[in-house]
A protein has these predicted regions:
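Adenine nucleotide-associated cytosolic modules
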Residues: 1-370
Length: 370
């Protein structure tokens, strides 16, 4: 066993050699190295990609020491990424780690497979970066921690899911085939129950006789019983069935295309996969309000009454504007939203740890799409 195989032995056992090879070729750019960004960086460097680049040219403050576990008091005033990279380099000698000198993310995108933004920025720029990633088939993740709240938006473009339920392909032995306007296939279920359902597809193999059924085409099951089913195929003039054969389940691939943030900004109205609760709708409203406040003030709100009143007015404006759209199902919970705003500047370490785990798992999912 080589050194790298020994280092990643548990991952290889969990994901398989093919997935580990994909991870080892991945190049990731991470914007924002506070609590959430450092958790993501740490997790993914330990997973063994080819390259991880970070960017955060903000100066380290005393507040950063509460969430970025690589920083010390003596680092206050230094640049976040330049200081953090020293410790990140120690995590895994097989991963190239560096930091960008400038924040021209648009120019650097072509060098990476995946862009992760873990720091709030102008929502218009976020949407432009997302669009650039979408058009160029790059992965995109935008994730934020506001106090006790964690947000994550993922866009991995168009992809195919193979075997969505990870089921083992089912096969059954053929006992007999009856010719007719509809072809009836009898299953030998002496040792195994027949568990396929009407509407599913099968391929027929290794039949002696009836060579017309051995064309490799998938056929739809109809009139399914416990030991037989039919296919809509006129076999009246086919060769006679002699013996044997296998019915093999066809596991259909599912095509999914992630939507861009610009379209999904009205998520509760357009998302096909969830039925959001009132609390989740209020969270989304808070997410939009925080971005509008940030765009207008170049900062997140303080816990002062002045800032809280400003952002609550923004929230009411967005709510009223979309009352006939996605906000029609929201019972506005001002106290709940106000608590989010009070602590929006804070990145609480346990929440960052949780969020970092979620994002890291999304990155592992991404390699399955390549």
């Amino acid at each position: 066993m080589s050194d790298t195989e020994e280092l990643y032995s548990r991952q290889i056992a969990a994901y398989g050699t093919n997935s580990m090879n994909k991870i080892s070729k991945l190049k990731i750019l991470i914007y924002g190295i506070r609590g959430l960004g450092i958790e993501i960086s740490k997790n993914i460097i330990l997973a063994g990609p080819q390259k991880v680049t970070i960017f955060d040219n903000n100066k380290i403050t005393i507040e950063d020491l509460g969430s970025n576990f690589f920083l010390e008091e003596k680092d206050i005033g230094s640049r976040r990424d330049k200081t953090s990279i020293k410790k990140l380099l120690e995590l895994n000698n097989y991963v190239k780690c560096d930091y960008l000198k400038d924040d021209n993310l648009e120019m650097h995108l072509k060098e990476y497979d995946l862009l992760i933004i873990s720091e709030i920025m102008d929502i218009d720029r976020i949407m432009k970066l997302n669009k650039a990633c979408h058009l160029n088939k790059k992965g995109f993740i935008y994730c934020l921690v506001f106090g006790l709240s964690f947000y994550c938006f993922v866009d991995f473009g168009k992809h195919i899911i193979n075997n969505i339920n990870n089921n083992e392909q089912r096969r059954y032995y053929i006992k007999n085939i009856k010719k007719g306007k509809k072809t009836m296939i009898f299953i030998d279920n002496e040792f195994e129950n027949f568990e396929l359902n009407e509407g599913e597809y099968v391929i027929l193999k290794d039949i002696k006789g009836m060579s017309q059924l051995l064309d490799g085409k998938k056929r739809r099951i109809i009139n399914c019983k416990k030991d037989k089913f039919e296919i809509e195929e006129d076999s009246t003039n086919y060769e006679d069935f002699i013996q044997g054969g296998i019915v093999e389940e066809v596991i259909e691939n599912i095509i999914i295309e992630y939507k861009e943030l610009e379209e999904m900004i009205n998520l509760p109205e357009k998302c096909e996969y969830i039925n959001p609760t009132n609390k989740e709708l209020n969270l989304h409203l808070a997410f939009l309000s925080l971005h509008k406040f940030y765009k207008e003030n170049k900062k997140l709100p303080d816990s002062t009454n002045n800032d809280l009143n400003k952002i609550l007015n923004i929230t009411k404006y967005i709510y009223k504007k979309n009352k006939k759209g996605w906000c029609k199902n929201i019972n506005l919970d001002e106290e709940y939203i106000k608590d989010i705003y009070k602590y929006s500047k804070c990145e609480i370490s346990p929440i960052c740890g949780y969020g970092g785990g979620v994002v890291s798992q999304e990155i592992i999912k991404y390699i399955g799409l390549q």
